[in-house]
């Protein structure tokens, strides 16, 4: 379908499709500690999907960067952070792990989806935009 972009597809459908594409492709470099690490200091437990959560985070980050001009690690930490349960005290926002978001960006950069922006942060590359649009078109065709 010509003219289909990531904006035309529901976010969850696209993220699941792109995560499965990245997992099938096997080029994304996954750190060895992903099965035991928490994604934020505010979380009590690591993700339940020990095998595929890194691919879903990578797909989500790629979509997030696609929707904006450029994004840095700090903005991703704030985006993927959440509320920390502090017992009887009120909840408080805690940023996500910067190491995980940095490793995701480095892995996406290594396979050519994102590139370093001269203004700071990362932006989507031409090849990355083409790949994401292609996956979005396939996802839209499957939904119809």
Curated annotation (Swiss-Prot):
Keywords: Cytoplasm, Ribonucleoprotein, Ribosomal protein, Ribosome biogenesis. Changing residue 63 to E: Loss of mature 18S rRNA, protein binds 20S pre-RNA complex poorly. Lethal in double RPS19A/RPS19B mutant. The keyword Ribosomal protein applies. One of its GO terms (biological process) is ribosomal small subunit assembly. GO terms for cellular component: cytosol; cytosolic small ribosomal subunit. Disruption phenotype: Disruption of a single RPS19 gene reduces cell growth; a double disruption is lethal. Depletion experiments show the proteins are required for correct maturation of precursor rRNA to generate the 18S small rRNA. A specific site between the 18S and 5.8S precursors (site A2 in ETS1) is not cleaved in disruption mutants. Partially assembled ribosomes are retained in the nucleolus rather than being exported to the cytoplasm. All effects are exacerbated in the double disruption. Increases association of NOC4 with 20S/21S pre-rRNA, decreases association of ENP1, TSR1 and RIO2 with 20S/21S pre-rRNA. GO terms for molecular function: RNA binding; structural constituent of ribosome. Changing residue 122 to E: Decreases mature 18S rRNA, protein binds 20S pre-RNA complex poorly. Lethal in double RPS19A/RPS19B mutant. It is found in: Cytoplasm. Its main location: cytoplasm. Present with 29000 molecules/cell in log phase SD medium. There are 2 genes for eS19 in yeast. Component of the ribosome, a large ribonucleoprotein complex responsible for the synthesis of proteins in the cell. The small ribosomal subunit (SSU) binds messenger RNAs (mRNAs) and translates the encoded message by selecting cognate aminoacyl-transfer RNA (tRNA) molecules. The large subunit (LSU) contains the ribosomal catalytic site termed the peptidyl transferase center (PTC), which catalyzes the formation of peptide bonds, thereby polymerizing the amino acids delivered by tRNAs into a polypeptide chain. This is Small ribosomal subunit protein eS19A. The lineage of its organism: Eukaryota, Fungi, Dikarya, Ascomycota, Saccharomycotina. The gene is RPS19A.
């Amino acid at each position: 379908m010509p003219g289909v972009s990531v904006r035309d597809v529901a976010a969850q459908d696209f993220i699941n499709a792109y995560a499965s594409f990245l997992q099938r492709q096997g080029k994304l470099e996954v750190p060895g500690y992903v099965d035991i690490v928490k994604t934020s200091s505010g979380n009590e437990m690591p993700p339940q999907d020990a095998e595929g959560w890194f691919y879903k985070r990578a797909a989500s980050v790629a979509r997030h960067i696609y929707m904006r001009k450029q994004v840095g690690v700090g903005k991703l930490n704030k985006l993927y952070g959440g509320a920390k349960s502090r017992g009887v005290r009120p909840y408080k926002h805690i940023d996500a792990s910067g190491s995980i978001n940095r490793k995701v960006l480095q892995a996406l950069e290594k396979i050519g989806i994102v590139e370093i922006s001269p203004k700071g942060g990362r932006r989507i590359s031409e090849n990355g935009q083409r790949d994401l649009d292609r996956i979005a078109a396939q996802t839209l065709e499957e939904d119809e």
